[in-house]
């Protein structure tokens, strides 16, 4: 029987979410935990991949379990095996044809920054210097909305069949200010039907250049039209990036028995 699993993780100690040879990954830890309980391999199919150092407040994956396997207390048992920086929230039954990656309707990422030195933000927020113009960055971010070719924000070596993505929201949200009204923490929020590798970090890096006045607001449209990675800014560091939400159609979820 197929199940969707919902979990979160701090990506600081992992070489990304997806399994790869001779590397510690989130998928590898999940498959190890399932195998210990099931006493047999249990391949996990992730909803997507995150790079090394990137975090997820909500990630989904699907796994096929034996029909007779009891799922009561499974979340508790798996959390007892998983490392402290991976937390399983729930396991829900889905249709046999449901796919964690291909059935996703949208994904939302947040990029979190701070202007202050804070030891409690190490690895979870990117520290930037003051002076960012958030009004300019939000005007530039508005150019991202819609279905467009985002090759300029993609890794150069990639095997994707299309660079088109549909972005439905992209904006900066002010989180904290000091007593003088200066921004000390902010978050960039972006939602799309799909994302290219390194896309969010490349967008944020380009927005930083606009925010600091190194580029004009109109340059964002020029970068998009170039279809060339070298036209965009440097990628922002991985540490401030979080996958925060993945949306699915309700039709793929099976009714949960209350008996």
For the regions a protein language model found, what residue spans apply to each?
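Structured-RNA-binding interfaces characteristic of tRNA pseudouridine synthases
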Residues: 1-259
């Amino acid at each position: 029987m197929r199940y969707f699993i919902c979990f979160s993780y701090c990506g600081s100690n992992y070489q990304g979410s997806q399994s790869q040879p001779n590397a510690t990954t989130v998928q590898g830890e999940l498959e190890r935990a399932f195998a210990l309980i099931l006493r047999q391999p249990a391949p996990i199919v992730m909803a997507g991949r995150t790079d090394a150092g990137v975090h997820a407040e909500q990630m989904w994956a699907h796994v096929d379990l034996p029909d007779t396997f009891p799922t009561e207390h499974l979340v508790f048992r798996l959390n007892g095996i998983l490392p402290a920086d991976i937390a399983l929230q729930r396991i829900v039954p889905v249709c046999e044809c449901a796919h964690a990656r291909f059935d996703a309707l949208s994904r939302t990422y947040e990029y979190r920054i701070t202007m202050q030195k804070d030891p409690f933000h190490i690895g979870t927020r990117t520290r930037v210097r003051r002076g960012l113009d958030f009004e300019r960055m939000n005007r530039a971010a508005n150019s991202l909305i819609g279905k467009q070719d985002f090759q300029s924000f993609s890794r150069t070596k990639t095997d994707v069949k299309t660079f088109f993505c549909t972005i439905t929201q992209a904006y900066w949200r002010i989180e904290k200010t000091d007593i003088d009204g200066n921004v000390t923490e902010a978050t960039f929020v972006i939602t799309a039907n799909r994302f290219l590798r390194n896309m969010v970090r490349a967008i944020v890096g380009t927005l930083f250049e606009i925010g600091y006045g190194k580029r004009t607001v109109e340059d964002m449209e020029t970068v998009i039209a170039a279809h060339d990675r070298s036209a965009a800014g440097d990628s922002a560091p991985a540490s401030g990036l979080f996958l925060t939400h993945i949306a699915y159609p309700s039709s793929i979820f099976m009714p949960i028995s209350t008996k």
